[in-house]
């Protein structure tokens, strides 16, 4: 990309989407210059890789061999550890959260939450945990890193290592289970033939001011509505 363009990332992403339009979400995922090729079997995979390399060559785009990984059944892609059976958080990112120093000002909290939010769907009741922290980022709120905020900060760091940090992939022929509660927390899970249940994703958010006035029945309906809207 030449220097001086107004929106080079968006322009390049659009270009990549155009040249790989026939492969996107079929056996290719692309984010800027990070290309992931996936297949159901090794024979098909070699064919798909050749197609990708051919497309790159035809458009005068070239890969550095030292940055390429071939024939992997587990790979680190965009902050996630992807395998045939599961989706995990990048442990180096988790360690960064574990080592994060206690916030001293609002910008520190904003930076921490911005980083942690990337993995929010791995953490059950994430929104409830961070409420004391998000309150401190609201306009007009005086800085006071109270015991509640400190507990929230430590609880979130702990949640990244003590909760279930491994998610399974959605499988079309498996039974889906959606669980929710009146606190707007929800879990999407798969039930396997063995009877075991594994989470696919977690979702949560806090109530808005008007929603806090809902009775229990309406809060439960809202939780169901939001869960099905997300998934």
Predicted regions and their residues:
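Two-metal-ion RNase H-like nuclease active-site motif
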Residues: 174-183, 224
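C-terminal reverse transcriptase regions that engage the nucleic-acid substrate
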Residues: 7, 26, 31, 57, ...
